[in-house]
A protein has these predicted regions:
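Conserved alpha-helical scaffold segments that buttress catalytic/binding sites
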Residues: 1-107, 134-135
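A short, acidic, flexible beta-alpha connecting loop/helix-capping segment that sits on the rim
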Residues: 83, 119-123
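Short, electropositive alpha-helical surface patch
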Residues: 95-96, 125-139
Length: 139
């Protein structure tokens, strides 16, 4: 967020835990929307601990609508798979099949997309969840 905060040529969107109680703690509040030329080009969608998949996908819909309105040329996804219900450090409630749904939703944007794995600590399920995103994206 910080490196893009004053830029209008890149839209930054993040769905994450509410920083008042969850990581990233020090930034990512909904009111942080950018500054100067970047005002309005930073969208934080913080969610309460224990948020359901329905809540998370509601935030994803908001994110995708904003990305579509922006008219992006490409999409870079910092893919945090710590949203998995079985993740030892997270309180989100996504299940394995939700990751395929995530991939499908991002594919519907019709943008060249790069996925960068950023988090996910349920080691036994991490690979399956990552593959589910890619398979959903490619379907």
């Amino acid at each position: 967020q910080a490196i893009l905060y004053d830029r209008a040529d890149v839209l930054f969107v993040s769905i994450h835990g509410d920083p008042r109680t969850e990581y990233p703690f020090y930034l990512g509040h909904a009111g942080e929307t950018g500054t100067g030329e970047g005002a309005g080009f930073n969208l934080n969608l913080p969610l309460a601990a224990g948020s359901s998949a329905d809540t998370w996908f509601g935030a994803l819909d908001v994110a995708c609508e904003r990305i579509a309105r922006y008219g992006a040329d490409a999409l870079v996804v910092s893919l945090g798979l710590d949203t998995f219900a079985g993740d030892p450090i997270s309180t989100f409630k996504l299940q394995g099949d939700d990751f395929s749904r995530l991939g499908s939703r991002l594919q519907a944007l019709g943008l060249p997309t790069a996925f960068i794995l950023e988090g996910g600590y349920a080691a036994a399920e991490l690979g399956d969840n990552a593959v589910a995103v890619i398979e959903g994206f490619e379907s």
